[in-house]
């Protein structure tokens, strides 16, 4: 049995501070539409010590809808954890769709692998156990113009998001989308100072404040910052 919705509200980062409204969204719109294998993976992940890293079910539906609306086929995922967003993407892609998934910890990915296999989408995924920057640099050298990617989703080490952006804005095609997760960071980015955070959390918070300012001024993309989950920023490449 997975964590209750009340537990979910307490342990997961969220922008929506009304737990009753969050429960309503999850129970009414998200969970009834959640794929069986995504539900199983979510329930397993909610028992994990790093369960707060789980992409929420309502955000998963948002990502799936966007991928389908774009008719995306080639995607990149940086930061996999147990693979909830990865499985979401794989299910949304067509049968010949491909995902290059990069994470430093394969053991977390292996938690989700049985659910990916049961869903019949393992063939769409190329998992690479590595730091992301060297892999992206290699991809930049090897990827031809006609093989650029349609979509990228980043949910990894927060201090490197700006570095990932510089690579992804070249790897994703013009008109393609780059999504950054957690960009509102509990809502704490609204304040110049936010006492009480763990030092690592504060580093991430400041990184996101800098990233948000940078993306808003980047002429290569147009952006929309969506207050779902812990905040998702969508960048559409312009040139």
Swiss-Prot record:
4'-O-methyltransferase converting norbelladine to 4'-O-methylnorbelladine. 4'-O-methylnorbelladine is a precursor to all Amaryllidaceae alkaloids such as galanthamine, lycorine and haemanthamine, and including haemanthamine- and crinamine-type alkaloids, promising anticancer agents. This is Norbelladine 4'-O-methyltransferase 4. It catalyses: norbelladine + S-adenosyl-L-methionine = 4'-O-methylnorbelladine + S-adenosyl-L-homocysteine + H(+). Pathway: Alkaloid biosynthesis. The gene is N4OMT4. Belongs to the class I-like SAM-binding methyltransferase superfamily. Cation-dependent O-methyltransferase family. The keyword Transport does not apply. A divalent metal cation binds at residues 155, 181-182. The keyword Transferase applies. InterPro entries: Cation-dep_OMT, SAM-dependent_MTases_sf, SAM_O-MeTrfase. Keywords: Alkaloid metabolism, Metal-binding, Methyltransferase, S-adenosyl-L-methionine, Transferase. Its EC number is 2.1.1.336. S-adenosyl-L-methionine binds at residues 55, 77, 79-80, 85, 103, 132, 157. GO terms for molecular function: metal ion binding; O-methyltransferase activity; S-adenosylmethionine-dependent methyltransferase activity. GO terms for biological process: alkaloid metabolic process; methylation.
